[in-house]
C-alpha cells in the first residue's frame, strides 16, 4: 500500500506523487512497447546561450515563472534564443492534476499582489512587443484568478502601451460569470483557452474539466468582445482519431473561435499518459487545410506547435512552420 501524499501549502507534487492523486486511474500496460520518436521529432537542441541564461536570470530576479520551464516545453531553447517567453502567473502550483501536463500540483500559496507590477516592469525591461500570459488553475480563488489576469493586463498597458497581450486562461470552472464580468472591463488583445483534446478523452486526460464548458467560455468571450480574436489549442497522439479532431475544429468554429494551434503530445515522464502515436507532418498539413477550409483566420499545425509557439506571428496571420529541419 502506497503512503498517502501530504498536501502542504507551497509544496510541488510532480510525476508519481501527482499522478497518485488523479481520481481516474490509467494503468500502463507493461507489455506495451514505448513508442520511439520518429525522425521528424528528433531535433538537436542548441547549447545554452547568453539569451537563454539572460531570460532565466531575469525571471529568477523578479520571482516570475515561465510555462516554458514549468511544463518542460520542447521549444524552450528556440523561444528563449529568440528573446521570447510565455509568463505563468499566480504561482507554479496548479490545483488540477491533468496527467498529460508536467506543471506541479498541490496547494498553492496566496497570490502575490506585487506580481502584476513586477511582470509589467520585466516586460518593459525586456522590450517585448507581444507577450503571452498564462496561469495555473486556481480553483481555490473566488473568480479563478480572473482579476489577477486583469491586473496584469492593466499594468502591462500602463508601462508598455504598444505591447500586445495574449492571455491563455484556465476554464474558470464554476466561476465563469465572475470571470466574464472581469474581462468585460479589461479584455486582452487575444483570448486563448485550450480544449486540449477530443471530448471522448476528457475523463482520462482532463479530470475536473468539461468540454462543453470550455466551448461556452470561448463563445461568451467572443459574444462580449466580437473584435477580440479567440484562440484554442489541441494536442494529438493521446488516442484520439483524426475524425474526432475534425469535429473539435468544427465545434470551435461554431463557437466563434478564430485561431487554432494543433501539435503533438509528448509524454513528460513515464508517470504521465503515454503517447499512443506520433502524427506525421503530412497529416498536420492536411488538418491545417481542413481548418482553413472551416474558416479559421490562422491555423498553426505541426508536431512542435504549442499554444504560444510564435504567438506573435500567429496573431499577425503569418505562416508558422510546426516542424523543424534536422
Swiss-Prot record:
[4Fe-4S] cluster 1 binds at residues 68, 73, 79, 308. Residues 80-297 form the Radical SAM core domain. One of its GO terms (cellular component) is cytoplasm. Pathway: Protein modification; protein lipoylation via endogenous pathway; protein N(6)-(lipoyl)lysine from octanoyl-[acyl-carrier-protein]: step 2/2. Its main location: cytoplasm. Its cofactor is [4Fe-4S] cluster. It comes from the Bacteria. Binds 2 [4Fe-4S] clusters per subunit. One cluster is coordinated with 3 cysteines and an exchangeable S-adenosyl-L-methionine. SMART domains: Elp3 (SM00729). One of its GO terms (molecular function) is metal ion binding. [4Fe-4S] cluster 2 binds at residues 94, 98, 101. InterPro entries: Aldolase_TIM (IPR013785), Elp3/MiaA/NifB-like_rSAM (IPR006638), LIAS_N (IPR031691), Lipoyl_synth (IPR003698), rSAM (IPR007197). Keywords: 4Fe-4S, Cytoplasm, Iron, Iron-sulfur, Metal-binding, S-adenosyl-L-methionine, Transferase. Its EC number is 2.8.1.8. It is found in: Cytoplasm. It catalyses: [[Fe-S] cluster scaffold protein carrying a second [4Fe-4S](2+) cluster] + N(6)-octanoyl-L-lysyl-[protein] + 2 oxidized [2Fe-2S]-[ferredoxin] + 2 S-adenosyl-L-methionine + 4 H(+) = [[Fe-S] cluster scaffold protein] + N(6)-[(R)-dihydrolipoyl]-L-lysyl-[protein] + 4 Fe(3+) + 2 hydrogen sulfide + 2 5'-deoxyadenosine + 2 L-methionine + 2 reduced [2Fe-2S]-[ferredoxin]. Belongs to the radical SAM superfamily. Lipoyl synthase family. PANTHER family: LIPOYL SYNTHASE (PTHR10949), LIPOYL SYNTHASE, MITOCHONDRIAL (PTHR10949:SF0). This is Lipoyl synthase. It comes from Aeromonas salmonicida (strain A449).
Amino acid at each position: 500500500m502506497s503512503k498517502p501524499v501530504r498536501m502542504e501549502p507551497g509544496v510541488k507534487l510532480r510525476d508519481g506523487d501527482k499522478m497518485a492523486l488523479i481520481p481516474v486511474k490509467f494503468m500502463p500496460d507493461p507489455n506495451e512497447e514505448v513508442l520511439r520518436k520518429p525522425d521528424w521529432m528528433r531535433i538537436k537542441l542548441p547549447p545554452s546561450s547568453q539569451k537563454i541564461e539572460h531570460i532565466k536570470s531575469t525571471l529568477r530576479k523578479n520571482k516570475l515563472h515561465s510555462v516554458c520551464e514549468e511544463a518542460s516545453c520542447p521549444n524552450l531553447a528556440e523561444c528563449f534564443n529568440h528573446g521570447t517567453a510565455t509568463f505563468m502567473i499566480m504561482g507554479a502550483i496548479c490545483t488540477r492534476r491533468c496527467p498529460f501536463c508536467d506543471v506541479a500540483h498541490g496547494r498553492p500559496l496566496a497570490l502575490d499582489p506585487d506580481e502584476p507590477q513586477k511582470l509589467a516592469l520585466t516586460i518593459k525591461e525586456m522590450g517585448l512587443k507581444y507577450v503571452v500570459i498564462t496561469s495555473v488553475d486556481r480553483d481555490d480563488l473566488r473568480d479563478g484568478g480572473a482579476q489577477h489576469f486583469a491586473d496584469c493586463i492593466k499594468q502591462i498597458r500602463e508601462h508598455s502601451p504598444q505591447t500586445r497581450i495574449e492571455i491563455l486562461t484556465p476554464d474558470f470552472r464554476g466561476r465563469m460569470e465572475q470571470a466574464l464580468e472581469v474581462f468585460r472591463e479589461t479584455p486582452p488583445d487575444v483570448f486563448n483557452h485550450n480544449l486540449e483534446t477530443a471530448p471522448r478523452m476528457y475523463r482520462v486526460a482532463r479530470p475536473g474539466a468539461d468540454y462543453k464548458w470550455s466551448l461556452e467560455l470561448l463563445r461568451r468571450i467572443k459574444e462580449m468582445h466580437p473584435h477580440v480574436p479567440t484562440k484554442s489549442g489541441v494536442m494529438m497522439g493521446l488516442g484520439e482519431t483524426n475524425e474526432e479532431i475534425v469535429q473539435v475544429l468544427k465545434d470551435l468554429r461554431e463557437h466563434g473561435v478564430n485561431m487554432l494551434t494543433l501539435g503533438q503530445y509528448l509524454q513528460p515522464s513515464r508517470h504521465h499518459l503515454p503517447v499512443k502515436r506520433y502524427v506525421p507532418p503530412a497529416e498536420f498539413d492536411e488538418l491545417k487545410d481542413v481548418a482553413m477550409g472551416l474558416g479559421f483566420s490562422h491555423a498553426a499545425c505541426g508536431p512542435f506547435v504549442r499554444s504560444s509557439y510564435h504567438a506573435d506571428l500567429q496573431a499577425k496571420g503569418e505562416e508558422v512552420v510546426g516542424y523543424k529541419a534536422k
